[in-house]
Each structure stands twice: as structure tokens, then as C-alpha cells.
Design a protein with these regions (language model features):
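Sec-dependent N-terminal signal peptides
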Residues: 4-13
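Boundary at the C-terminal end of the N-terminal hydrophobic targeting segment
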Residues: 16-19
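A short, Trp-centered hydrophobic/proline-enriched beta-strand micro-motif
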Residues: 27-47
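Short, solvent-exposed coil/turn segments at beta-strand boundaries
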Residues: 31, 53-59, 74-77, 120-121, ...
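Short hydrophobic/aromatic-rich beta-strand segments that constitute the beta-sheet cores
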Residues: 39, 60-64, 79-82, 126, ...
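An acidic-aromatic
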Residues: 52-100, 159
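Flexible, surface-exposed loop/linker segments and immediately adjacent secondary-structure boundaries
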Residues: 84-123, 128
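Gly/Pro-enriched, hydrophobic low-complexity segments
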Residues: 109-183
Length: 183
């Protein structure tokens, strides 16, 4: 009888510790308040690099490596891109695919209902179709961390963002999500 109980507990313990791919990704997202990372972005063949901080929900600050003057920032309602020429472009966040990418609760709800696609045993992909947006979200198959996304941007350009040097739940300055003032 003791052997049967031992086998039962071993099987149940292994099932608990090794949940499904979706469960692991969802738990990882639930436990994430913010992300800091380096990125490489490819928009129709034009490659830009920099670093970003995401704070859930819906806040992002990215500093591009273009003369250290191009930034992208969202305060949760608006998205502003300040170019290296000091020109500001302001958008309603809800009109961009970032509205969904920056909302971890939306991602969790979508992932629960979607079928994952495993790519080369290294990446996990979920394709989200929402409000005429196609968003592909990619996770690492080893640690279930976010590693990038692919969208059509507000100009219908294909945008691919790769994440590296990811840090989770770091102390961040709250004022970095303040929108830059118009000239």
C-alpha cells in the first residue's frame, strides 16, 4: 500500500511542477510587474536597436541607439514617438498593436484560449487576431519568458521586435513614462 501511495504522490508532484506550456507562460506573466530589456526592431528591413522598460499595464519607455535622442513612450493612454529630429508623433495607445502587447491581462486571456505553436523546440508562438491586428507573441521554451513580437504597425508596416538581456521585476523610475512635452 505504501508503494502505491508513493507512486501516486510522485506522479501528482511531477504533474504539478511541470505544468503545461500555457500554464507556465501564464504563471510567468502573472508574476511579472515589469520588464527591462535590449531590443532589435526590424520595420520593413530598417533595423533599429535600443533598450526598453515595460511596466504593466500599458506603459513602455524605449530609448533608441540613434544619437540617443529617439524615444518611444506610453503613459498607458497615449503613445509618443520623439524622433532624433525632435519631432513628436502622438497616438492614442488603443489604436496601436502595443495596446494589446502591453496588457498582460489581455495576453493571459488570449493565451488561455489559443493553441501554441512550437518553433524549432526553442520558441513558443501565439497568434492573436484582434480588431484587424495580427500579433504574434514569442516566448522562450526553456524559461517561458517573452522574447519578442511581430505586428503590423499603425502604417501597416511589418514590425518585428527581438528581446535580449531580459530582466524581470526591477526597480524602475516611475517618471520615465511621462510623455515628452510638445515643442
Amino acid at each position: 500500500m505504501k508503494k502505491i501511495l508513493l507512486i501516486f504522490f510522485i506522479i501528482n508532484f511531477s504533474n504539478l511542477s511541470f505544468g503545461s506550456i500555457k500554464e507556465n507562460i501564464i504563471n510567468n506573466l502573472r508574476n511579472t510587474d515589469n520588464l527591462s530589456f535590449d531590443f532589435e526592431q526590424n520595420i520593413n528591413g530598417k533595423i533599429e536597436k535600443g533598450n526598453c522598460v515595460i511596466e504593466y499595464p500599458k506603459k513602455i519607455f524605449c530609448n533608441y541607439n540613434v544619437d540617443d535622442s529617439k524615444i518611444l513612450v506610453s503613459n498607458g493612454r497615449y503613445l509618443v514617438i520623439k524622433t532624433d529630429n525632435n519631432i513628436l508623433y502622438r497616438y492614442s495607445l488603443e489604436r496601436t498593436p502595443l495596446n494589446y502587447i502591453l496588457d498582460k491581462n489581455f495576453l493571459i486571456d488570449e493565451i488561455q484560449d489559443l493553441e501554441e505553436k512550437i518553433i524549432d523546440d526553442k520558441f513558443i508562438n501565439f497568434k492573436i487576431l484582434k480588431d484587424d491586428n495580427e500579433i504574434n507573441i514569442f516566448f522562450n521554451s526553456t524559461n517561458y519568458n517573452l522574447i519578442g513580437w511581430q505586428t503590423l504597425d499603425i502604417y501597416q508596416n511589418l514590425s518585428i521586435t527581438y528581446i535580449s538581456s531580459l530582466k524581470i521585476n526591477q526597480l524602475i523610475e516611475k517618471n520615465i513614462f511621462k510623455l515628452p512635452a510638445s515643442n
